A protein has these predicted regions:
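Adenine nucleotide-associated cytosolic modules
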Residues: 1-267
Length: 267
């Protein structure tokens, strides 16, 4: 159910007309987007296309968190930035563009690195839990921290990754106790050597981040608008070099130190 007394304005009806015409997508779905609050961690190769699509689709509140500055090497794939933006904060620069793309929604940017100590404040938990976290970061250690925050505060987490010509995507719902990021990638997170493979040293094709960022946005729109998880206990694996995509099932790890820990769950 959407929140009471929420309606679409004439401008919103015109802007989202093609979306509302979709089979299986009605006015209630669009209204759910309007009342949704999404926090995106990482305003880079994944965060740029994901945030732009969500903003264009009508997600009512989009908050970007990133502590990095724009570099020349980012321009190849980070679609919200221009050469004149080099050395500017990613989060604030991206939000300025997003606000121009859709002035009918609320966009916020914070220059900070999200961690377990500042999560309550940065996620504005005093105002209530966000409806969805989007992990658009680029290393296992940071993703594991975001996962711990997701489990701690019981916030759904949509995690994407992209490197070279490959990508992965999963949507974890800690409130359903069906497993978390650590259940799937725990062994990799604990392997420091694996964390060294990043876009900076392994490369990434521009289209890879565009595809994965928009697949991430697609899953977010279905989750927020249609209240369904298209990836329940499934990891989507995309291989751009072979133009192949497959789904791999996973289960909750009963020994997971994150989502199976009574200490974490009770915080």
């Amino acid at each position: 159910m959407v929140k009471e007394m929420v309606q679409l304005s004439d401008d919103e009806l015109l802007r989202y007309a093609r979306q509302v015409l979709l089979d299986g997508w009605d006015m209630d779905a669009q209204l759910r987007l309007k009342t949704a609050r999404v926090v995106i961690i990482g305003a880079g190769g994944l965060g740029c296309p994901a945030s732009e699509t969500l903003v264009r689709a009508g997600v009512g509140y989009v908050h970007l968190i990133d502590d990095d500055e724009i570099e020349a090497s980012n321009l190849q794939r980070q679609t919200l930035f221009l050469p004149d933006d080099i050395s500017k904060p990613k989060a604030l620069t991206a939000v300025a563009i997003l606000a121009r793309i859709n002035p009918l929604i609320k966009t916020y940017g914070t220059v900070a690195r999200l961690d377990e100590d500042n999560a309550y404040e940065l996620l504005d938990m005093a105002a209530g839990k966000p409806d969805l976290l989007l992990d658009c970061t680029d290393n296992f250690a940071t993703r594991d921290i975001i996962n711990r925050i997701s489990v701690r505060y019981q916030i759904p987490l949509l995690s994407a990754s992209a490197i070279a010509m490959q990508g992965q995507l999963a949507l974890f719902e800690p409130q359903l106790d069906t497993g978390c990021y650590h259940c799937v990638f725990g062994s990799v997170v604990l392997d420091e050597a694996a964390d060294e493979r990043t876009c900076a040293n392994s490369g990434v094709l521009a289209s890879t981040t565009a595809v994965m960022g928009n697949l991430q946005a697609n899953a977010a729109l279905q989750y927020l608008g249609l209240t369904k998880n298209p990836l329940t206990n499934k990891l989507l694996i995309w291989d751009g070099s072979q133009m192949q995509q497959r789904l791999m099932g996973y289960r909750k790890d009963p020994q997971c130190p994150v989502c199976s820990s009574p200490i974490i769950n009770s915080l």
